[in-house]
C-alpha cells in the first residue's frame, strides 16, 4: 500500500514514530555521528543525526524560538551569549535578533555538522554564521566551559539528548550546571532543551530537579513540535529572573523594543502558553527528588 522508504525514530524501546522519506539529499559520517539531510513528505527538509530528527524546515522555528526567547527576553539587555551545540545555526539566528547583543559564542564539537549546515541548511541559519558578532568555535563544550575566562549574560544549551553512554550525558549533570553558573554574570541565566515530557517524562523531571539544586529560579516550559510528534520541554534557570512570571503585555512590549525581524511562533500569548504546564507534569517535576550527577547521569529511554 505504501511503497516509499520510512524513517523510524524510536521514542522508547516500545514505541517509534515513522516519517515517509521522499528522498535522501545528503548523508555524511563524522568522527562523532551520522548526519543525514532528508526530504520528508510532510515536513520537507529534515536534519537527522544518529537516527534522531533534530529539526525540520516546516517547524524548526517552534523549537528554536521556544528555546531562545523566553530566557533572553527576561534578561536586561544581554550582550554576551554562549551557545553549546546548535549546529544548524538556527539557535544562533534567534540569539542574534537582540539589539543589545554584541557577541555570540557558539561551541560545537563536530566540524562536519557545521560545514554541513553552512552548505545545506541556509533556511535554518539565514547567514548567521557570517554575522560579525558570531564567534564560532569547533571544540568540546565541556572543556570550553572549564577553560574559558569570559562571563556570559546567557547560556543556551541546544544539545543532543542524553542518550545512555553518549558524551551528552555529562552536559546534563549538577557538576556541569555548577560550572556553567560560575561563568554566568550575576544578572544572567541559562536555558536547556530538556527532552520530551511525552516520551521521557522522568528525564525531563530529573533535569528540572538537577537545575533546582544549582539555581534559585527554575521554570519549565513545554510546547508541541509536530515533527517530534509530542510535547518538547525547555528549562530556564537563573538566580535573578524567572520568565514564567512575565505576562503577555510585558513580552510583547519587550519584543517590540529589543528584537529585530519578525518571529513566527513566539509572542506574549505564546509565552503564557509555554508555561501553562499540565497538572500531571507539574506534579511530577515538583516531586522529583533524583539528581543527575557524573556518577549517575540522567538518560533518555531510547
From Swiss-Prot:
SUPFAM superfamilies (alphabetical): S-adenosyl-L-methionine-dependent methyltransferases
PROSITE patterns associated with the record: PABS_1 (PS01330), PABS_2 (PS51006)
Keyword check for Signal: no
All copies of domain PABS, residue ranges: 4-239
Protein name as it appears in the record: Polyamine aminopropyltransferase
Family: Belongs to the spermidine/spermine synthase family.
Binding site for spermidine: 64, 88
NCBIfam families named among the record's database cross-references: PRK00811.1 (NF002010)
EC number, as in UniProt: 2.5.1.16
Listed pathway(s): Amine and polyamine biosynthesis; spermidine biosynthesis; spermidine from putrescine: step 1/1
Compartments, record wording: Cytoplasm
Gene Ontology cellular-component annotations: cytoplasm
Keywords, ordered alphabetically: Cytoplasm, Polyamine biosynthesis, Spermidine biosynthesis, Transferase
Lineage: Archaea, Thermoproteota, Thermoprotei, Sulfolobales, Sulfolobaceae
Main subcellular location: cytoplasm
Molecular function as annotated in GO: spermidine synthase activity; thermospermine synthase activity
Binding site for S-methyl-5'-thioadenosine: 33, 108, 140-141, 167
GO biological process terms, semicolon-separated: spermidine biosynthetic process
Active site residues per record: 158 (proton acceptor)
Stated role: Catalyzes the irreversible transfer of a propylamine group from the amino donor S-adenosylmethioninamine (decarboxy-AdoMet) to putrescine (1,4-diaminobutane) to yield spermidine.
Subunit structure, as described in the record: Homodimer or homotetramer.
Amino acid at each position: 500500500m505504501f511503497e516509499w522508504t520510512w524513517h523510524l525514530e524510536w521514542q522508547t524501546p516500545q514505541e517509534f514514530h515513522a516519517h515517509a522519506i521522499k528522498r535522501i539529499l545528503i548523508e555524511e559520517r563524522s568522527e562523532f555521528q551520522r548526519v543525514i539531510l532528508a526530504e520528508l513528505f510532510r515536513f520537507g527538509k529534515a536534519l537527522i543525526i544518529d537516527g534522531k530528527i533534530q529539526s525540520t524546515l516546516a517547524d524548526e522555528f517552534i523549537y528554536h524560538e521556544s528555546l531562545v526567547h523566553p530566557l533572553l527576553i527576561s534578561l536586561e539587555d544581554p550582550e554576551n551569549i554562549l551557545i553549546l551545540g546548535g549546529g544548524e545555526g538556527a539557535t544562533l539566528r534567534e540569539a542574534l535578533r537582540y539589539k543589545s547583543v554584541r557577541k555570540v559564542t557558539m561551541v560545537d564539537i563536530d566540524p562536519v555538522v557545521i560545514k554541513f549546515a553552512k552548505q545545506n541548511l541556509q533556511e535554518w541559519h539565514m547567514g548567521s554564521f557570517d554575522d560579525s558578532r558570531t564567534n564560532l568555535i569547533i571544540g568540546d563544550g565541556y572543556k570550553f566551559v572549564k577553560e574559558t575566562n569570559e562571563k556570559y549574560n546567557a547560556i543556551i544549551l541546544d544539545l543532543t539528548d542524553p542518550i545512555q553512554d553518549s558524551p551528552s550525558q555529562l552536559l546534563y549533570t549538577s557538576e556541569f550546571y555548577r560550572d556553567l553558573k560560575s561563568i554566568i554574570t550575576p544578572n544572567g541565566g541559562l536555558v536547556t532543551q530538556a527532552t520530551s515530557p511525552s516520551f521521557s517524562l522522568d528525564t525531563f523531571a530529573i533535569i528540572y530537579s538537577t537545575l533546582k539544586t544549582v539555581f534559585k529560579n527554575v521554570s519549565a516550559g513545554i510546547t508541541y513540535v509536530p515533527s517530534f510528534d509530542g510535547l518538547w520541554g525547555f528549562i530556564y534557570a537563573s538566580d535573578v529572573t524567572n520568565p514564567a512570571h512575565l505576562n503577555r503585555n510585558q513580552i510583547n512590549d519587550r519584543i517590540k523594543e529589543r528584537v529585530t525581524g519578525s518571529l513566527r511562533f513566539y509572542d506574549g500569548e505564546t509565552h503564557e502558553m509555554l508555561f501553562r504546564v499540565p497538572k500531571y507534569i507539574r506534579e511530577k517535576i515538583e516531586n522529583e527528588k533524583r539528581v543527575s550527577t557524573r556518577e549517575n547521569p540522567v538518560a533518555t529511554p531510547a
